Amino acid sequence: SMASIKGNKSSEMGLHEEVLTGRTQQVFFNPEESENFFYHDAYDVDFNKRTEIDASNIECLDINRRIRELMAEGYGTIVIKNPGSKHSIGVGILNKLNLIIEGSLGYFGIGSTDGPNVRISGRVGWSCAENMMAGKVVVEKNAGSCFGAAIRGGDLICKGSVGARSGIDMKG
């Protein structure tokens, strides 16, 4: 009872006086408000402004760098042609973006994202769309193992088959 803890050190510090009933640490937002939340360095893109990247002779680091440069220029729809199953394409996109990939990706494609809508016309290797926070990824063919591991939100769709451990550690 409260009488027995009055003499405790925690009681002297005021730890037993705050009423916690009916309180929560959760913050609730409605969907309309969440559309206006952006990262401080997010780009203002126009989905009607469209461009293409021919990835046939470009390394994956340079492809990702080029995506960011184009977003900085206001492009909201980017088409990547000839991805050649390269690894780690489209990772770390924390922005609204329509990303269309005409072909297949290797390992770790479209990982650690928050916001883009991605359509992949081919297949993806293992660990595609890991740690996705928001947005949508649609794979037209098959996906490897660990597809969508550790996603927290968003929509992840594979129209073909997926490998083992798909969706492991999901929190969304």
Per-region residue spans from a language model:
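Charge-rich, low-hydrophobicity low-complexity segments
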Residues: 1-169
